[in-house]
């Protein structure tokens, strides 16, 4: 069983612009979730969304900035709804844009509940990167 979500997207924007969408709280909220993010290693913050009681999710994702290498890498912890994982965004200039790789790792491949959560989040990450992030970048 797999224990990670991996997505890959090409965005027709420079890495610095994509980086801002990942690290400026207002831009991050516009494509992901409301948050109190600060781009400081060690900073603890939350993302907030609608609770999903059936999955034991209170609507709060508790995070901490683990690694910050502007404008090429952001890694955070991601805990909520019974999972304790990490999310890493890697950015690389490519042609007239940016290649954005997302890795959401640390799921228990043997736990059916975590596998279900991983499937839900996998679809969400794909949709957010493909549509919502691109819309935020186009509008900012």
What are these regions (language model features)?
Residues 1-15:
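Terminal, regulation- and interaction-focused segments at domain boundaries
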Residues 6-7, 17, 25-60, 73:
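Short beta-edge strand/loop motif at the mouth of beta-sheet-based domains
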Residues 18, 28, 45-47, 65, ...:
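Hydrophobic pocket/interface hotspot
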Residues 21-22, 68:
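Conserved catalytic core of Hanks-type protein kinase domains
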Residues 22, 32, 78, 137:
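Short, flexible helix/strand-to-coil boundary loops that buttress conserved ligand/catalytic motifs
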Residues 36, 52-101, 105-108:
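Hydrophobic-ligand binding "helix-grip"
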Residues 106-140:
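A conserved amphipathic terminal alpha-helix motif
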């Amino acid at each position: 069983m797999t224990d990670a979500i991996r997505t890959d997207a090409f965005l027709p924007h420079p890495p610095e612009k994509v980086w801002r969408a990942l690290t400026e709280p207002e831009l991050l909220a516009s494509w992901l979730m409301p948050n109190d993010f600060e781009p400081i290693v060690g900073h603890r913050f939350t993302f907030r969304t609608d609770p999903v009681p059936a999955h034991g999710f209170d609507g709060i994702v508790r995070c901490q900035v683990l690694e910050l290498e502007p404008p090429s890498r952001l890694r955070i912890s991601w805990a909520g709804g019974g999972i304790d994982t990490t999310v890493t965004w890697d950015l690389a200039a490519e042609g007239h844009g940016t290649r954005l790789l997302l890795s959401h790792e640390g799921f228990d491949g043997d736990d059916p509940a975590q596998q279900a959560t991983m499937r839900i989040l996998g679809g969400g990450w794909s949709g957010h990167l493909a549509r919502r992030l691109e819309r935020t970048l186009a509008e900012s």
